[in-house]
């Protein structure tokens, strides 16, 4: 199985390296094209006003291409130009921090997988519910085995499998649950701070209100210790609103 591996935390991130080695141990051919620098929460951004430069990374049994660009840049450049062998699957992760609910709109990790799907490839995004993962070897091995079990040919066109791990060892996690994503939005605020020179700046903070999270959704199940899998599809159409608007305009 040929894999294009990318992420949004950067090519030297713990999660990407763990997933790389897990896939390699499973006998897969892994080609890495990932951002040189962290690109968290850049969404589906592409570089239009700056050139994309590429740097080769080789160390400690790892080899990959780092791109001075966004996660989506990496996937587009990799699939169209850089890869020697076309992949069977595009895999993005393992991200530091869960990607559930509205996170999927902000996430560079999910967007990279989505770009792979839009370009016609099966795709999976993988995240871990902690911003400070120390050891993700077992999660990497789990993903490698899961990739073999997913019926990719039977999934809908341009479907992304969004996988999230709870912040516990795999052996201590609750069973895998296939579920929908929560529709709860973040309640955001900005903390006003001051730098050493007396200049004001702002730092984003926020919470996802627990009381508004529906039972059985990704955030709910992940909090309860389950590994969650949510199939995503790029289609923002509000079909009910179509009928309402047609009636309003007499169409």
Curated annotation (Swiss-Prot):
For this UniProt record, the keywords arranged alphabetically read as follows: Cytoplasm, Hydrolase, Metal-binding, Nucleotide-binding
One Pfam match, by short name? SurE
Give the organism, scientific name. Maridesulfovibrio salexigens (strain ATCC 14822 / DSM 2638 / NCIMB 8403 / VKM B-1763)
Q: Which domain of life is it from?
A: Bacteria
The record's GO molecular-function terms, alphabetically, read: 5'-nucleotidase activity; metal ion binding; nucleotide binding
**Claim: Hydrolase is one of the keywords in the record:** yes
Q: What class of enzyme is it?
A: hydrolase
- What is the protein's given name? 5'-nucleotidase SurE
Please list the residues that bind a divalent metal cation: 8-9, 40, 95
Describe the reaction catalysed, as an equation.
a ribonucleoside 5'-phosphate + H2O = a ribonucleoside + phosphate
Could you give the cofactor binding note from the entry?
Binds 1 divalent metal cation per subunit.
């Amino acid at each position: 199985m040929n894999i294009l591996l990318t992420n949004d935390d950067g090519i030297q991130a713990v999660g990407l390296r763990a997933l790389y080695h897990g896939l390699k141990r499973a006998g897969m051919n892994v080609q890495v094209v990932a951002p040189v620098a962290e690109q968290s929460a850049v969404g589906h951004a592409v570089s239009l006003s700056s050139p994309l430069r590429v740097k080769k990374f080789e160390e400690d049994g790892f080899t990959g291409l780092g791109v001075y660009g966004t996660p989506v840049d990496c996937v587009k450049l990799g699939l169209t130009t850089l890869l020697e062998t076309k992949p069977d699957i595009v895999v993005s992760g393992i991200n530091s921090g869960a990607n559930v609910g509205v996170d999927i709109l902000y996430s560079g990790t999910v967007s990279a997988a989505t770009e792979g799907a839009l370009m016609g490839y099966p795709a999976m995004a993988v995240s871990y519910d902690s911003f400070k993962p120390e050891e993700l070897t077992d999660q990497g091995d789990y993903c490698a085995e899961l990739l073999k079990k997913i019926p990719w040919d039977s999934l809908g066109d341009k479907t992304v499998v969004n996988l999230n791990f709870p912040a516990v060892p795999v052996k201590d996690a609750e069973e895998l649950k296939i579920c929908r994503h929560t529709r709860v939005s973040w309640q955001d605020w900005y903390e006003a701070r001051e730098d050493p020179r007396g200049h004001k700046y702002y730092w984003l903070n926020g919470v996802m209100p627990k009381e508004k999270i529906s039972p059985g959704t990704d955030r709910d199940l992940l909090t309860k210790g389950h590994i969650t899998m949510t199939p995503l599809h790029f289609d923002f159409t509000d079909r009910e609103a179509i009928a309402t608007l047609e009636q309003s305009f007499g169409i």
